[in-house]
C-alpha cells in the first residue's frame, strides 16, 4: 500500500468534535452497561423514569452532535481517497447516527407505552424489536468504524490522528 504524503493529510477535528466523539463512546458504553435486561424491569418507576430521561438526553446530544459535525466539520479522509471509501465512510457514519437515534427514540416509546400500561401486544413488541435491531446494527457499524480507523492508522494518512488522541502517526 502506498502511504499518503503529508501534503495530502487532513488537518484534524476541533476540540469540540473530539469531545463529542469520545463523549459518545463513554455515554454509549454506559448505556450498554446499564441496559435493561427484560421489559418487566420497567415496573420500577424510578428505573423507568431514569431510562426515559437518559434516552431523551442521549437523543438531544446526538442531534446536537449531528448538526455540529455536519455544519462545522469536514471529512478527515484525504482528497486522494477512493470514491467508494468515501461513500462507505458516509454510510457508516450516517448509519451510526440512525441506529443511535433509533435506539433512543424506540427506548423513549417503550418507556412511554409501558408507563401508559401497554406492556404486551403487537405495538410494543414491534418497538422492542426495532430497539433490538438498532442495537445490533450499531454494534456492526461501530466495529466497521473501528476497523476503518485501524486501517487508516496503518496507512498513516492522517485520518487516525485527526480524531484519536493516542498512538499518533508521526
Report the location of each language-model feature.
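Membrane-embedded alpha-helical bundles that constitute the cytochrome b-like, heme-associated redox core
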Residues: 1-170
Amino acid at each position: 500500500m502506498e502511504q499518503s504524503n503529508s501534503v495530502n493529510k487532513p488537518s484534524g477535528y476541533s476540540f469540540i468534535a473530539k469531545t463529542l466523539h469520545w463523549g459518545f463512546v463513554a455515554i454509549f458504553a454506559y448505556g450498554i452497561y446499564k441496559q435493561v435486561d427484560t421489559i418487566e424491569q420497567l415496573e420500577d418507576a424510578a428505573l423507568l423514569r431514569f431510562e426515559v430521561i437518559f434516552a431523551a438526553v442521549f437523543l438531544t446530544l446526538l442531534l446536537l452532535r449531528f448538526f455540529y459535525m455536519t455544519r462545522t466539520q469536514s471529512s478527515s479522509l484525504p482528497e486522494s481517497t477512493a470514491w467508494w471509501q468515501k461513500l462507505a465512510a458516509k454510510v457508516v457514519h450516517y448509519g451510526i447516527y440512525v441506529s443511535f437515534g433509533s435506539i433512543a427514540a424506540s427506548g423513549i416509546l417503550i418507556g412511554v407505552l409501558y408507563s401508559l400500561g401497554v406492556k404486551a401486544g403487537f405495538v410494543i413488541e414491534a418497538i422492542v424489536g426495532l430497539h433490538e435491531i438498532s442495537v445490533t446494527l450499531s454494534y456492526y457499524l461501530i466495529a466497521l468504524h473501528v476497523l476503518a480507523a485501524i486501517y487508516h492508522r496503518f496507512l498513516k494518512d492522517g485520518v487516525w490522528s485527526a480524531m484519536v488522541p493516542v498512538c499518533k502517526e508521526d
